[in-house]
Amino acid sequence: MLVDKYGRVVDYLRISVTQRCNFRCRYCMPTTPFSWTPKENLLSFEELFLFVKVAIDEGVTKIRLTGGEPLVRKDLDVFVKMISDYKPDIDLALTTNGFMLRHYAKRLRDAGLKRINMSLDTLNEQKAKFIAQKSVLHEVLTGFEAALDAGLKVKINTVALKGVNDDELINLLEFARFRNSQIRFIEYMENSHAKDDLKGLKSDEILDIISQKYNVTKDEKLPNAPASIYRLDDGYKFGIIDPHKHDFCESCNRIRLSAEGLLIPCLYFEDALSIKDAVSRGDIIGASEILRQVLANKPKENKWAVGAANETSSRAFYQTGG
Protein backbone atom coordinates (compact mmCIF):
# COMPACT_ATOMS: atom_id res chain seq x y z
CA MET A 1 0.00 0.00 0.00
CA LEU A 2 1.21 3.50 -0.88
CA VAL A 3 0.60 6.11 1.83
CA ASP A 4 1.96 9.66 1.82
CA LYS A 5 3.20 11.58 4.87
CA TYR A 6 -0.25 13.09 5.40
CA GLY A 7 -1.86 9.67 5.69
CA ARG A 8 -3.48 9.70 2.25
CA VAL A 9 -3.62 6.33 0.50
CA VAL A 10 -2.34 6.80 -3.06
CA ASP A 11 -3.90 4.16 -5.30
CA TYR A 12 -4.51 6.10 -8.53
CA LEU A 13 -1.98 6.55 -11.35
CA ARG A 14 -2.63 8.93 -14.24
CA ILE A 15 -0.40 8.30 -17.25
CA SER A 16 0.07 10.92 -19.95
CA VAL A 17 0.92 8.78 -22.98
CA THR A 18 1.61 11.86 -25.13
CA GLN A 19 1.71 15.63 -24.75
CA ARG A 20 0.55 16.10 -28.34
CA CYS A 21 -3.01 17.18 -28.98
CA ASN A 22 -5.16 17.76 -32.05
CA PHE A 23 -6.97 20.65 -30.31
CA ARG A 24 -5.58 23.99 -29.10
CA CYS A 25 -8.03 24.62 -26.28
CA ARG A 26 -7.74 28.11 -24.88
CA TYR A 27 -7.78 26.98 -21.25
CA CYS A 28 -4.93 24.53 -21.80
CA MET A 29 -2.54 25.42 -24.61
CA PRO A 30 0.01 28.26 -24.67
CA THR A 31 -0.44 31.38 -26.77
CA THR A 32 3.24 31.61 -27.65
CA PRO A 33 5.00 29.28 -30.11
CA PHE A 34 6.19 26.00 -28.62
CA SER A 35 7.43 22.60 -29.75
CA TRP A 36 6.47 19.10 -28.69
CA THR A 37 8.93 16.81 -26.97
CA PRO A 38 10.49 14.66 -29.74
CA LYS A 39 8.88 11.23 -29.99
CA GLU A 40 12.20 9.50 -29.42
CA ASN A 41 12.35 11.10 -25.95
CA LEU A 42 9.06 9.53 -24.87
CA LEU A 43 8.81 6.29 -22.96
CA SER A 44 7.83 3.32 -25.08
CA PHE A 45 4.70 1.41 -24.15
CA GLU A 46 6.98 -1.37 -22.87
CA GLU A 47 8.76 1.09 -20.55
CA LEU A 48 5.47 2.59 -19.39
CA PHE A 49 4.15 -0.91 -18.76
CA LEU A 50 7.14 -1.81 -16.61
CA PHE A 51 6.27 1.07 -14.31
CA VAL A 52 2.57 0.18 -14.44
CA LYS A 53 3.45 -3.27 -13.09
CA VAL A 54 5.50 -1.69 -10.30
CA ALA A 55 2.65 0.65 -9.39
CA ILE A 56 0.02 -2.11 -9.41
CA ASP A 57 2.22 -4.38 -7.30
CA GLU A 58 2.68 -1.51 -4.82
CA GLY A 59 -1.08 -0.99 -4.46
CA VAL A 60 -2.39 1.10 -7.37
CA THR A 61 -5.95 -0.01 -8.23
CA LYS A 62 -6.96 2.67 -10.74
CA ILE A 63 -5.17 3.84 -13.89
CA ARG A 64 -6.25 6.61 -16.23
CA LEU A 65 -4.63 7.26 -19.61
CA THR A 66 -4.44 10.92 -20.57
CA GLY A 67 -2.49 13.27 -22.83
CA GLY A 68 -2.35 15.69 -24.52
CA GLU A 69 -4.90 13.71 -26.45
CA PRO A 70 -4.11 10.03 -25.82
CA LEU A 71 -5.77 8.79 -29.01
CA VAL A 72 -3.18 10.55 -31.20
CA ARG A 73 -0.61 8.01 -29.97
CA LYS A 74 -0.59 5.01 -32.27
CA ASP A 75 -1.64 1.59 -30.93
CA LEU A 76 -3.07 2.86 -27.65
CA ASP A 77 -5.41 -0.14 -27.58
CA VAL A 78 -2.34 -2.40 -27.48
CA PHE A 79 -1.14 -0.63 -24.33
CA VAL A 80 -4.63 -0.90 -22.83
CA LYS A 81 -4.57 -4.66 -23.43
CA MET A 82 -1.12 -4.99 -21.84
CA ILE A 83 -2.45 -3.41 -18.65
CA SER A 84 -5.75 -5.29 -18.71
CA ASP A 85 -4.05 -8.66 -19.27
CA TYR A 86 -1.72 -8.03 -16.31
CA LYS A 87 -4.54 -6.98 -13.96
CA PRO A 88 -7.98 -7.78 -15.44
CA ASP A 89 -9.88 -6.16 -12.56
CA ILE A 90 -7.93 -2.88 -12.67
CA ASP A 91 -10.12 0.21 -12.95
CA LEU A 92 -8.81 1.32 -16.35
CA ALA A 93 -10.08 4.59 -17.80
CA LEU A 94 -9.30 7.15 -20.51
CA THR A 95 -9.64 10.92 -20.73
CA THR A 96 -10.18 12.19 -24.28
CA ASN A 97 -11.48 15.12 -26.28
CA GLY A 98 -13.53 12.59 -28.24
CA PHE A 99 -12.51 13.75 -31.70
CA MET A 100 -11.02 10.38 -32.76
CA LEU A 101 -13.16 8.22 -30.51
CA ARG A 102 -15.50 7.06 -33.27
CA HIS A 103 -12.57 5.12 -34.75
CA TYR A 104 -11.32 3.56 -31.52
CA ALA A 105 -14.16 3.12 -29.01
CA LYS A 106 -14.90 -0.54 -29.77
CA ARG A 107 -11.22 -1.49 -30.04
CA LEU A 108 -10.52 0.10 -26.67
CA ARG A 109 -13.50 -1.63 -25.05
CA ASP A 110 -12.41 -4.99 -26.48
CA ALA A 111 -8.87 -4.37 -25.18
CA GLY A 112 -10.14 -3.94 -21.61
CA LEU A 113 -10.91 -0.23 -21.21
CA LYS A 114 -13.81 0.27 -18.81
CA ARG A 115 -14.60 3.98 -18.68
CA ILE A 116 -14.12 7.25 -20.51
CA ASN A 117 -14.16 10.86 -19.41
CA MET A 118 -14.81 13.08 -22.42
CA SER A 119 -14.44 16.84 -22.73
CA LEU A 120 -17.55 18.64 -23.95
CA ASP A 121 -17.59 22.36 -23.21
CA THR A 122 -20.39 23.43 -25.54
CA LEU A 123 -23.11 22.17 -27.87
CA ASN A 124 -22.65 25.18 -30.14
CA GLU A 125 -20.45 24.70 -33.21
CA GLN A 126 -19.08 28.26 -33.22
CA LYS A 127 -18.25 28.16 -29.51
CA ALA A 128 -16.58 24.78 -29.93
CA LYS A 129 -14.46 26.25 -32.71
CA PHE A 130 -13.61 29.24 -30.50
CA ILE A 131 -12.51 27.03 -27.59
CA ALA A 132 -10.63 24.33 -29.52
CA GLN A 133 -9.50 26.72 -32.28
CA LYS A 134 -10.72 24.29 -34.96
CA SER A 135 -14.04 22.86 -36.10
CA VAL A 136 -14.64 19.82 -33.88
CA LEU A 137 -18.17 19.49 -32.56
CA HIS A 138 -19.61 16.97 -35.05
CA GLU A 139 -16.72 14.55 -34.56
CA VAL A 140 -16.84 14.94 -30.77
CA LEU A 141 -20.56 14.17 -30.57
CA THR A 142 -20.14 11.23 -32.94
CA GLY A 143 -17.35 9.92 -30.73
CA PHE A 144 -19.55 10.25 -27.65
CA GLU A 145 -22.27 8.12 -29.23
CA ALA A 146 -19.69 5.58 -30.44
CA ALA A 147 -18.40 5.16 -26.89
CA LEU A 148 -21.91 4.53 -25.57
CA ASP A 149 -22.61 2.08 -28.40
CA ALA A 150 -19.40 0.22 -27.53
CA GLY A 151 -20.65 -0.30 -23.99
CA LEU A 152 -18.25 2.12 -22.30
CA LYS A 153 -19.32 4.17 -19.31
CA VAL A 154 -18.92 7.84 -20.24
CA LYS A 155 -18.66 10.92 -18.05
CA ILE A 156 -18.65 14.41 -19.52
CA ASN A 157 -16.16 17.06 -18.35
CA THR A 158 -17.14 20.69 -18.91
CA VAL A 159 -14.90 23.65 -18.06
CA ALA A 160 -17.26 26.44 -16.99
CA LEU A 161 -16.15 29.75 -18.55
CA LYS A 162 -17.68 33.19 -18.06
CA GLY A 163 -19.03 34.68 -21.25
CA VAL A 164 -18.31 31.52 -23.22
CA ASN A 165 -20.51 28.64 -22.10
CA ASP A 166 -22.15 29.92 -18.92
CA ASP A 167 -25.43 30.24 -20.83
CA GLU A 168 -25.26 26.55 -21.81
CA LEU A 169 -24.70 24.82 -18.49
CA ILE A 170 -28.31 23.70 -18.14
CA ASN A 171 -28.42 22.48 -21.76
CA LEU A 172 -25.20 20.53 -21.22
CA LEU A 173 -26.54 19.01 -18.01
CA GLU A 174 -29.71 17.92 -19.81
CA PHE A 175 -27.70 16.52 -22.71
CA ALA A 176 -25.81 14.30 -20.27
CA ARG A 177 -28.86 13.46 -18.17
CA PHE A 178 -30.93 12.26 -21.11
CA ARG A 179 -28.07 9.95 -22.11
CA ASN A 180 -27.57 8.60 -18.59
CA SER A 181 -24.07 10.07 -18.37
CA GLN A 182 -22.79 12.08 -15.44
CA ILE A 183 -21.54 15.57 -16.20
CA ARG A 184 -18.88 17.24 -14.06
CA PHE A 185 -18.48 20.99 -14.30
CA ILE A 186 -14.85 21.95 -13.74
CA GLU A 187 -13.69 25.24 -12.31
CA TYR A 188 -11.13 26.80 -14.62
CA MET A 189 -7.66 26.15 -13.20
CA GLU A 190 -5.47 29.18 -13.78
CA ASN A 191 -2.19 28.27 -15.43
CA SER A 192 0.47 30.25 -17.24
CA HIS A 193 -0.05 28.35 -20.51
CA ALA A 194 -3.70 29.37 -20.96
CA LYS A 195 -5.22 32.48 -22.50
CA ASP A 196 -5.00 35.42 -20.09
CA ASP A 197 -8.48 36.70 -20.87
CA LEU A 198 -10.33 33.55 -19.73
CA LYS A 199 -12.37 33.74 -16.55
CA GLY A 200 -13.92 30.72 -14.94
CA LEU A 201 -17.08 30.25 -12.93
CA LYS A 202 -16.71 29.19 -9.32
CA SER A 203 -18.78 26.35 -7.91
CA ASP A 204 -21.33 28.65 -6.26
CA GLU A 205 -21.92 30.43 -9.56
CA ILE A 206 -22.40 27.11 -11.36
CA LEU A 207 -24.92 26.01 -8.74
CA ASP A 208 -26.78 29.31 -9.00
CA ILE A 209 -27.24 28.76 -12.75
CA ILE A 210 -28.43 25.14 -12.39
CA SER A 211 -30.75 26.17 -9.55
CA GLN A 212 -32.57 28.59 -11.84
CA LYS A 213 -34.34 25.54 -13.32
CA TYR A 214 -33.77 22.66 -10.92
CA ASN A 215 -33.95 21.99 -7.21
CA VAL A 216 -30.41 20.94 -6.32
CA THR A 217 -29.40 18.97 -3.23
CA LYS A 218 -25.82 18.31 -2.19
CA ASP A 219 -25.05 14.60 -2.07
CA GLU A 220 -22.46 12.77 -0.05
CA LYS A 221 -19.02 13.10 -1.62
CA LEU A 222 -17.40 9.81 -2.53
CA PRO A 223 -14.08 9.06 -0.81
CA ASN A 224 -11.08 10.31 -2.85
CA ALA A 225 -13.35 11.71 -5.58
CA PRO A 226 -12.34 15.17 -6.86
CA ALA A 227 -15.93 16.21 -7.56
CA SER A 228 -18.55 17.46 -5.14
CA ILE A 229 -21.75 15.62 -6.06
CA TYR A 230 -25.22 17.19 -6.38
CA ARG A 231 -28.58 15.58 -7.02
CA LEU A 232 -31.71 16.68 -8.84
CA ASP A 233 -35.17 15.70 -7.61
CA ASP A 234 -35.39 12.86 -10.14
CA GLY A 235 -32.20 11.32 -8.72
CA TYR A 236 -29.81 12.40 -11.49
CA LYS A 237 -26.41 13.28 -10.08
CA PHE A 238 -23.87 15.75 -11.46
CA GLY A 239 -20.52 16.89 -10.15
CA ILE A 240 -18.49 20.05 -9.69
CA ILE A 241 -14.71 19.83 -9.52
CA ASP A 242 -13.66 22.80 -7.45
CA PRO A 243 -9.89 22.97 -6.87
CA HIS A 244 -10.25 26.44 -5.34
CA LYS A 245 -11.95 24.94 -2.28
CA HIS A 246 -9.73 24.53 0.75
CA ASP A 247 -10.57 20.84 1.20
CA PHE A 248 -9.96 19.81 -2.43
CA CYS A 249 -6.62 18.17 -1.63
CA GLU A 250 -7.58 16.45 1.63
CA SER A 251 -8.34 13.13 -0.02
CA CYS A 252 -6.00 13.32 -3.04
CA ASN A 253 -5.06 9.76 -3.95
CA ARG A 254 -3.19 10.26 -7.22
CA ILE A 255 0.20 10.63 -8.81
CA ARG A 256 0.96 11.39 -12.46
CA LEU A 257 3.43 10.00 -14.96
CA SER A 258 4.32 12.11 -17.99
CA ALA A 259 5.04 10.67 -21.43
CA GLU A 260 8.75 11.42 -21.09
CA GLY A 261 8.97 9.65 -17.73
CA LEU A 262 8.50 12.35 -15.09
CA LEU A 263 6.68 11.11 -12.00
CA ILE A 264 4.69 14.02 -10.63
CA PRO A 265 3.23 14.19 -7.10
CA CYS A 266 0.91 17.17 -7.67
CA LEU A 267 -0.77 18.77 -10.68
CA TYR A 268 -0.12 22.31 -9.42
CA PHE A 269 3.58 22.17 -8.62
CA GLU A 270 6.55 21.59 -10.95
CA ASP A 271 8.26 19.03 -8.67
CA ALA A 272 8.94 15.69 -10.37
CA LEU A 273 11.47 12.86 -10.58
CA SER A 274 12.34 10.90 -13.70
CA ILE A 275 11.88 7.13 -13.93
CA LYS A 276 13.23 7.04 -17.49
CA ASP A 277 16.67 5.64 -16.72
CA ALA A 278 15.27 3.03 -14.35
CA VAL A 279 12.63 1.67 -16.72
CA SER A 280 14.91 1.82 -19.77
CA ARG A 281 17.29 -0.62 -18.08
CA GLY A 282 14.46 -2.71 -16.59
CA ASP A 283 15.31 -1.72 -13.02
CA ILE A 284 12.13 -2.59 -11.11
CA ILE A 285 13.70 -1.92 -7.70
CA GLY A 286 14.97 1.48 -8.84
CA ALA A 287 11.57 2.43 -10.26
CA SER A 288 9.91 1.39 -7.00
CA GLU A 289 12.35 3.51 -4.98
CA ILE A 290 11.61 6.55 -7.15
CA LEU A 291 7.89 5.97 -6.66
CA ARG A 292 8.37 5.99 -2.89
CA GLN A 293 10.49 9.13 -3.08
CA VAL A 294 7.87 10.98 -5.15
CA LEU A 295 5.23 9.88 -2.67
CA ALA A 296 7.31 11.41 0.13
CA ASN A 297 7.41 14.69 -1.84
CA LYS A 298 3.63 14.88 -2.31
CA PRO A 299 2.53 18.29 -0.95
CA LYS A 300 -0.36 18.83 1.42
CA GLU A 301 -2.33 21.09 -0.93
CA ASN A 302 -2.25 23.17 -4.10
CA LYS A 303 -2.21 26.97 -4.19
CA TRP A 304 -5.50 27.44 -6.02
CA ALA A 305 -7.26 27.09 -2.68
CA VAL A 306 -9.18 29.96 -1.13
CA GLY A 307 -6.77 32.06 0.92
CA ALA A 308 -3.82 31.36 -1.35
CA ALA A 309 -4.30 34.53 -3.39
CA ASN A 310 -5.53 32.53 -6.40
CA GLU A 311 -2.00 31.82 -7.54
CA THR A 312 -1.39 30.64 -11.08
CA SER A 313 0.27 27.30 -11.76
CA SER A 314 3.15 27.16 -14.23
CA ARG A 315 2.35 23.51 -14.95
CA ALA A 316 1.55 22.77 -18.59
CA PHE A 317 -1.57 20.65 -18.33
CA TYR A 318 -1.18 19.29 -21.85
CA GLN A 319 2.01 17.62 -20.61
CA THR A 320 0.49 16.03 -17.52
CA GLY A 321 -3.10 15.32 -18.47
CA GLY A 322 -4.81 17.68 -16.05
UniProtKB/Swiss-Prot annotation:
<feature type="binding site">
    <location>
        <position position="119"/>
    </location>
    <ligand>
        <name>S-adenosyl-L-methionine</name>
    </ligand>
</feature>
<comment type="pathway">
    <text>Cofactor biosynthesis; molybdopterin biosynthesis.</text>
</comment>
<dbReference type="GO" id="GO:0051539">
    <property type="term" value="F:4 iron, 4 sulfur cluster binding"/>
</dbReference>
<comment type="subunit">
    <text>Monomer and homodimer.</text>
</comment>
<feature type="binding site">
    <location>
        <position position="25"/>
    </location>
    <ligand>
        <name>[4Fe-4S] cluster 1</name>
    </ligand>
</feature>
<dbReference type="InterPro" id="IPR010505">
    <property type="entry name" value="MoaA_twitch"/>
</dbReference>
<keyword id="KW-0342">GTP-binding</keyword>
<feature type="binding site">
    <location>
        <position position="252"/>
    </location>
    <ligand>
        <name>[4Fe-4S] cluster 2</name>
    </ligand>
</feature>
<dbReference type="GO" id="GO:0046872">
    <property type="term" value="F:metal ion binding"/>
</dbReference>
<dbReference type="InterPro" id="IPR013483">
    <property type="entry name" value="MoaA"/>
</dbReference>
<keyword id="KW-0456">Lyase</keyword>
<keyword id="KW-0547">Nucleotide-binding</keyword>
<feature type="binding site">
    <location>
        <position position="27"/>
    </location>
    <ligand>
        <name>S-adenosyl-L-methionine</name>
    </ligand>
</feature>
<dbReference type="InterPro" id="IPR000385">
    <property type="entry name" value="MoaA_NifB_PqqE_Fe-S-bd_CS"/>
</dbReference>
<protein>
    <recommendedName>
        <fullName>GTP 3',8-cyclase</fullName>
        <ecNumber>4.1.99.22</ecNumber>
    </recommendedName>
</protein>
<dbReference type="Pfam" id="PF06463">
    <property type="entry name" value="Mob_synth_C"/>
</dbReference>
<dbReference type="GO" id="GO:0061798">
    <property type="term" value="F:GTP 3',8'-cyclase activity"/>
</dbReference>
<keyword id="KW-0479">Metal-binding</keyword>
<feature type="binding site">
    <location>
        <position position="155"/>
    </location>
    <ligand>
        <name>GTP</name>
    </ligand>
</feature>
<feature type="binding site">
    <location>
        <position position="249"/>
    </location>
    <ligand>
        <name>[4Fe-4S] cluster 2</name>
    </ligand>
</feature>
<keyword id="KW-0501">Molybdenum cofactor biosynthesis</keyword>
<keyword id="KW-0949">S-adenosyl-L-methionine</keyword>
<dbReference type="GO" id="GO:1904047">
    <property type="term" value="F:S-adenosyl-L-methionine binding"/>
</dbReference>
<dbReference type="InterPro" id="IPR050105">
    <property type="entry name" value="MoCo_biosynth_MoaA/MoaC"/>
</dbReference>
<keyword id="KW-0411">Iron-sulfur</keyword>
<dbReference type="GO" id="GO:0005525">
    <property type="term" value="F:GTP binding"/>
</dbReference>
<feature type="binding site">
    <location>
        <position position="95"/>
    </location>
    <ligand>
        <name>GTP</name>
    </ligand>
</feature>
<feature type="binding site">
    <location>
        <position position="21"/>
    </location>
    <ligand>
        <name>[4Fe-4S] cluster 1</name>
    </ligand>
</feature>
<feature type="binding site">
    <location>
        <position position="28"/>
    </location>
    <ligand>
        <name>[4Fe-4S] cluster 1</name>
    </ligand>
</feature>
<feature type="binding site">
    <location>
        <position position="64"/>
    </location>
    <ligand>
        <name>GTP</name>
    </ligand>
</feature>
<dbReference type="InterPro" id="IPR007197">
    <property type="entry name" value="rSAM"/>
</dbReference>
<feature type="binding site">
    <location>
        <position position="68"/>
    </location>
    <ligand>
        <name>S-adenosyl-L-methionine</name>
    </ligand>
</feature>
<feature type="binding site">
    <location>
        <position position="189"/>
    </location>
    <ligand>
        <name>S-adenosyl-L-methionine</name>
    </ligand>
</feature>
<feature type="binding site">
    <location>
        <position position="14"/>
    </location>
    <ligand>
        <name>GTP</name>
    </ligand>
</feature>
<dbReference type="Pfam" id="PF13353">
    <property type="entry name" value="Fer4_12"/>
</dbReference>
<feature type="domain" description="Radical SAM core">
    <location>
        <begin position="5"/>
        <end position="233"/>
    </location>
</feature>
<dbReference type="GO" id="GO:0061799">
    <property type="term" value="F:cyclic pyranopterin monophosphate synthase activity"/>
</dbReference>
<comment type="function">
    <text>Catalyzes the cyclization of GTP to (8S)-3',8-cyclo-7,8-dihydroguanosine 5'-triphosphate.</text>
</comment>
<feature type="binding site">
    <location>
        <begin position="254"/>
        <end position="256"/>
    </location>
    <ligand>
        <name>GTP</name>
    </ligand>
</feature>
<keyword id="KW-0004">4Fe-4S</keyword>
<feature type="binding site">
    <location>
        <position position="266"/>
    </location>
    <ligand>
        <name>[4Fe-4S] cluster 2</name>
    </ligand>
</feature>
<keyword id="KW-0408">Iron</keyword>
